[in-house]
Amino acid sequence: MSGHNKWSKIKNKKGSEDARRGKIFTKMARAITVAVREGGADPEYNPSLKSVIEKARAENMPNDNIDRAIKKASGDGDSANYENIVYEGYGPEGVAVIVECLTDNRNRTASDVRHYFDKFGGNLGQNGSVSFMFQRKGLLLIDADSLDEEEVMMDSLDAGAEDFEADDGIFVINTAMEDFAQVRDTLLDKGYKFVKSDLVYEPSNYVKINDESNVDKMEKLIDNLEDSDDVQQVSHNWDNE
C-alpha cells in the first residue's frame, strides 16, 4: 500500500466532514443494530459488535450514542431488517470500485448505486467483476501526535501486524484479515486510539485517471456514494496522488 495510502489527508478530510457527522452516526447505529441482532448485545461475546463499536469510536461517535444504539437494537425500537450487500463496478477510465451497503430496501439501494455509477461516467457490474483485484485486509490508523514511531511500530508488529508505515502524521498498520481483531485488541489494551479501525478492500494495483474531467467525475462518484445513507464503505483502486 506504500505510496498510495494518502492517509495523511484524513485530518483535513475529517474537518470537512464535521457537517456530515450526524449521517455517519446514523450509519454506525445501523451497523450496531445488525451486529446486536446477529450476536447479542455484549461485545465481549460478540466480535462483530466489538469491531463496529471500535469503528464508531474512531468516527468520534459518543459513548452515549453507542449505548443507546445497543439498547435500541436489543429491544423493539428498530423493526427494520437490514442486510449486507456488496456492489462492484467501474468508475471513469476503468477504476475498480467496491461499495459495501447495509440496507432495509435492496431495490432502493441498487437503484441509487446504479444511478451514481451512470451519472458519473461509470457502470455497475456483476458480483466478482472487480473484487478479484482486491484483497481483504485489516487497517488501523493511529494519529502520530506525541507518539514514538519506533515504539508504535514494535507494538504493532509484535501484536501480529503485517506491515507498518508512517505517512505524514498518521501511522498506518496493515493486518491479515484473520489477525485484525487480535492486533486491534492488543493495541487497544496498550492504550492506543484509532483514527480508523476496519476491514478494507486493498487493491492489488492502482489506476491513474488522465482526463481532468474524469477526475472530477470520479471524485463526485465517491462523494455521492459515501453520502448515501445505505452505503457503509467505498473502496477503489484510483491512484489520486
From Swiss-Prot:
Keywords: Cytoplasm, DNA-binding, Transcription, Transcription regulation
GO cellular component assignments: cytosol
Cell compartment(s), UniProt: Cytoplasm
SUPFAM superfamilies, sorted: YebC-like (SSF75625)
GO biological process, alphabetically ordered: regulation of DNA-templated transcription
Pfam family, one: Transcrip_reg
Location (main, coarse): cytoplasm
An example molecular function term from Gene Ontology annotations: DNA binding
Family: Belongs to the TACO1 family.
UniProt name for this protein: Probable transcriptional regulatory protein FMG_0893
Organism: Finegoldia magna (strain ATCC 29328 / DSM 20472 / WAL 2508)
